[in-house]
């Protein structure tokens, strides 16, 4: 459980009146704000705070969307034969547009190497 606290008494003067979030399950404390000695968002073991007295403060948690990593998907609805024919006969496909790395690009404007790469990456036999 997460508890918000304001330190009211401490051997370390840097901790006096600082605000922390205590995670009782992990035995950790996250610094919200301190005069000195601790960085904002720094996580330390509760034991590092030493002998302290504190008062609990209400904590309001707002949902936060945090995206770390993730994947990117380009969808091109085409047949392999269409792209292969566009490589051989670009004049027949002047408006053929595909998605590459999130951008729309004319297939004919790609280099031959890029065209081969798109064909190789786009079509698979199975998942």
UniProtKB/Swiss-Prot annotation:
Positions of post-translational N6-acetyllysine modification: 48, 88, 92
GO cellular component, one term: cytosol
Coiled coil region boundaries: none
Residues recorded as bearing Glycine radical in the entry: 102
Listed InterPro entries: Auton_GlycylRad_Cofactor, Form_AcTrfase_GR_CS, Gly_radical, Glycyl_radical_cofactor_GrcA
GO molecular function, a single term: formate C-acetyltransferase activity
Record's keyword terms, sorted: Acetylation, Organic radical
Glycine radical domain: residues covered: 5-127
Role, per record: Acts as a radical domain for damaged PFL and possibly other radical proteins.
Name of this chain's protein: Autonomous glycyl radical cofactor
Organism listed in the record: Escherichia coli O1:K1 / APEC
Gene: grcA
